[in-house]
Amino acid sequence: MRIPVLHDFFIKEQLKSCVSGAVLFDEPLDRYTSMGVGGPADALVVPQSMEELVQLVRFLRKENIPFLTLGNGTNLIVRDGGCRGVVVALRGLQKLSWASDPEGKIRVQAEAGVPLASIVQLCIKESLAGLEFCTGIPGSVGGAVRMNAGAFGREMKDVVTAITVLNEHLELETLSRRELSFEYRRLNLSDEAVIVCAEFALCPGERESISAEISEILALRKSKHPLNFRNAGSIFKNPRNLPAGQLIEETGLKGTRRGDAMISEKHGNFIVNLGHARAADVVDLIEEIKGRVENCRAIQLEAEVHIVGEDG
């Protein structure tokens, strides 16, 4: 049931006045997540600039309306009951620019909603080296930085030089790399802070070499990951020196189904949507994996995906 304040005509009109992008009520979230599951948001709002985002969040805080920010919807499971309050979709924050610095590096600035795929394409076009490891990672800049996304021995912390956040005081604040504390698949940042922009330091490179590495990574991902089905990416973080996918494969759970959700037969650390999966099915499989791995190997797997919302 929608929170009462979002039934108010005045509040609805105020929401619409905050942004030039879409304002949708009772909007199903399955179409906004890579897993393709999830119930409705009370409201989904799409700011088109940092200024609109600031205005929107200030209004939500003033009215005590809970909100959740949403990037590309990867690494996210929305429960079947959906999300109360407002989902703020950052896909409208799409500015991308770059320039040389005095040290000869290229500083790329990307707003939170820019897909990593767009930056990878920029790297090919402009012969920029350093972000090849992002090839095939389906997220956007904001989420990738917050979770310190990485692959092939590289992580966001290796290339991020600064981020701009909307902080808990509702002010835009720029934090330098030395002010940021990264861990494995995590940036230590207040839950109330919203990443709105990030800066990366890249190096001039050879286009042929960069393109070849990107093609190699794409081929490797296609060979190992179930890219022909909707999925949320890696379900669990890798324990130290032990791939989660290997642990799951050892339990014999690959191919296990709950409804239309299935533990991938191709890679044990992926759960795929065969067509009409429910979030409850996905969560059941996550709990089944955690229990089986703990029983078989005495290892507690930690989820990499975030589970939000209410049960249906």
Swiss-Prot record:
Record GO cellular component, one term: cytosol
Pfam family for this entry, one: MurB_C
Main location: cytoplasm
Pathway: Cell wall biogenesis; peptidoglycan biosynthesis
Cofactor(s) demanded: FAD
The keyword Cell cycle is assigned to this record: yes
InterPro entries: FAD-bd_PCMH, FAD-bd_PCMH-like_sf, FAD-bd_PCMH_sub1, FAD-bd_PCMH_sub2, MurB, MurB_C, MurB_C_sf, Oxid_FAD_bind_N
GO terms, molecular function: FAD binding; UDP-N-acetylmuramate dehydrogenase activity
Location of the protein in the cell: Cytoplasm
Principal EC category: oxidoreductase
Disulfide bonds: none
Active site (catalytic residues): 185, 234, 304
Catalytic activity as recorded in UniProt: UDP-N-acetyl-alpha-D-muramate + NADP(+) = UDP-N-acetyl-3-O-(1-carboxyvinyl)-alpha-D-glucosamine + NADPH + H(+)
UniProt-listed SUPFAM superfamilies: FAD-binding/transporter-associated domain-like (SSF56176), Uridine diphospho-N-Acetylenolpyruvylglucosamine reductase, MurB, C-terminal domain (SSF56194)
Entry keywords, A to Z: Cell cycle, Cell division, Cell shape, Cell wall biogenesis/degradation, Cytoplasm, FAD, Flavoprotein, NADP, Oxidoreductase, Peptidoglycan synthesis
Protein biosynthesis listed as a keyword: no
EC numbers: 1.3.1.98
A single BP term in Gene Ontology: peptidoglycan biosynthetic process
Domain FAD-binding PCMH-type intervals: 37-205
Known function: Cell wall formation.
Assigned protein family: Belongs to the MurB family.
HAMAP family: MurB (MF_00037)
Record's protein name: UDP-N-acetylenolpyruvoylglucosamine reductase
